[in-house]
């Protein structure tokens, strides 16, 4: 912990801080960053506001910590996939898609950074920067997998890989929002099915 009580870089948060982070992540995914307060955290976890402020002196610091943890979690998974030369490019894409399917199975959760993007103009600058980084990192990773798929004869692309990567990412994020509105799981499953079909070479469909 730092002198202010915030988790310091390179040091694992305490169990209480992790509880706060877990809840804040869920609240952002289901309500929005703007729509939750320290009072919500206090009520849900039975903590005093002073205790919450000890770990995260400001809501902006809590928001940054939530995004940093989320980005790191995704980043570690993507880095591990990059090292797996045995899996097909479609298998890697399927692995990437799994979190979207898991979110879609819930009544109200969506991607954390997708949720934050919807209120980008009211986020603290340090959070906006991290959300933008999440997007560009995922665009780049997807583009790499798509290019690998083309080189191996597993994918066919109608446009440059980075453009298709942006299409895939935006389609998945948007499908989650529509599914949350309609409650229809097909909103996500159909988008995924069409994306995969369009990437598959005609001879192997």
For each feature predicted by the language model, list its residue ranges.
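Amphipathic alpha-helical packing segments from all-alpha helical-bundle domains
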Residues: 75, 90, 94, 106, ...
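N-terminal intrinsically disordered/low-complexity leader segments
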Residues: 1-15, 205
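Amphipathic C-terminal alpha-helical segment
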Residues: 34, 103, 148, 168-186, ...
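Hydrophobic alpha-helical connector segments
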Residues: 65, 69, 79-109, 161-168
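Helix-turn-helix
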Residues: 19, 23-61, 65
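A general structural signal for well-ordered alpha-helical segments in protein cores
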Residues: 38, 59, 63, 93, ...
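Short helix-capping/turn signature of helix-turn-helix
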Residues: 56, 116-123
């Amino acid at each position: 912990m730092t002198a202010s009580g915030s988790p310091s870089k390179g040091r694992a948060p305490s169990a209480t801080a992790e509880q706060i982070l877990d809840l804040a992540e869920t609240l952002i995914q289901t309500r929005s960053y703007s729509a939750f307060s320290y009072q919500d955290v206090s009520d849900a976890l039975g903590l005093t506001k002073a205790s919450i402020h000890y770990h995260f002196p400001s809501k902006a610091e809590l928001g940054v910590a939530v995004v940093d943890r989320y980005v790191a979690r995704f980043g570690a998974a993507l880095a591990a996939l990059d090292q797996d030369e045995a899996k097909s490019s479609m298998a890697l894409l399927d692995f990437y898609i799994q979190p979207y399917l898991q979110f879609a199975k819930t009544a109200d959760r969506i991607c954390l950074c997708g949720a934050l993007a919807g209120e980008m103009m009211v986020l603290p600058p340090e959070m906006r920067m991290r959300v933008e980084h999440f997007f560009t990192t995922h665009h780049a990773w997807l583009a790499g997998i798509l290019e690998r798929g083309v080189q191996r004869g597993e994918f066919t692309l109608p446009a440059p890989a980075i453009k298709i990567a942006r299409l895939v990412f935006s389609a998945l994020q948007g499908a989650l929002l529509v599914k949350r509105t309609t409650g229809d799981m097909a909103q996500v499953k159909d988008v995924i099915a069409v994306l995969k079909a369009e990437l598959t070479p005609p001879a192997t469909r």
